[in-house]
Every structure is written in C-alpha cells, then in structure tokens.
Amino acid sequence: MLKAYKYRIYPNSEQRIQIAKTFGCCRFVYNQTLAYRKEIYEKEKKSISKTDCNNYCNRELKKDYEWLKEIDKFALTNAIYNMDAAYQKFFKEHAGYPKFKSKHDNHKSYTTNFTNGNIAVDFETEKIKLPKLKAVKARLHREYSGQIKSATVSQVSSGKYYVSILVETEHKELAHTNHNIGIDLGIKDLCITSDGKVYENL
C-alpha cells in the first residue's frame, strides 16, 4: 500500500536556488514537449507517446539547452509524464486541452524517484537527503516504516517549502474469525454490539 508523508523543509540559500532551477526547468520541459506533441499531431496527424517525448528531451532539448543537464533527470521525466497524463485525460475524459504552465503559478512542485539511496529520511538529525540538494533541514513530526518510492518537493504561495515522501508500506490483513456481529447505535450509549458489549459516549 502506498502512503504519502508530508513534511515542511527549510532549504538554505544554495538549496533554494537549485529548487527554483528545478521548478523552472520542469516547467520548461513540460511546455516544450507539449508543444512538440502538438506540432507532430498537426503536421503528421500522429500521436506520439511519453517515451517519444522523453527521447526528444534527452536527444534534442538537453543538446540545445545544456543547463537542463544540471537538473535531476527524474524530475524532468516526471514533468513529461505529467504532461502525458493531462494529454491522455483530454482524449479519454474529454477534459480541457492541456495548458502551458506559467512561471506565475502560485503552487510549484516537482517529483523525483528513489534509486540507489538517493532519497533518505534521517529522523535523528531531522534532515532529508534529496537528489542535487544533499541534506535538507526538515520538521519530521511523524515517523513511518516502509520503502521510499518517490519525493515531491513543493513551494506554496506563502513561500514555504514542503516535501511529500511516498512510501510503500506493508498491508496487514486482520485475521478472519468467521464471527459476525451486529451494532446498534444509540443515544445514551455510543453503541451496543450483539454480543452484549456496551461502548459509552465519550
């Protein structure tokens, strides 16, 4: 079972610059691949896949705009996949055509994937390790157990930064007792079960 844990982070000035660059580059790649997809469809009446768009980014965009190489590759790939999801929703659910992203959006975010320990949460030092950022100070108010799958870094309109850690946790099923029970909700008591147990109102 996948579960997300959201924490506030406190990046230093250097980390804030890198985060801002990542926001901007993800927006740029989203817009460029959306425009590329639209151009191919208008010229050739052919729909291309998210893999085609990702290849276009790696072979063309990173060649023409070398500063994209300074950004976490998973963040750029996920920006393309988000564009593809919006594009697929347009055709399957007749939603509005995907819009180009603006740098003036109040909510900014990017997602990176876990691989080879590139994301780690240290509850003792209250720091989170993230690609290209190293260790970021965080308020780790809630612990978890499980395997990290991804991390989404975001900045809200107030300027605060957050990271949402997606974790795969173990799903524990309750033992089957083959015992049925009825529950009578009451006014004086919260409920009375068919086996005679009374739960009082708090």
Cite the ranges covered by each PLM segment.
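Nucleic-acid substrate recognition interfaces
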Residues: 1-202
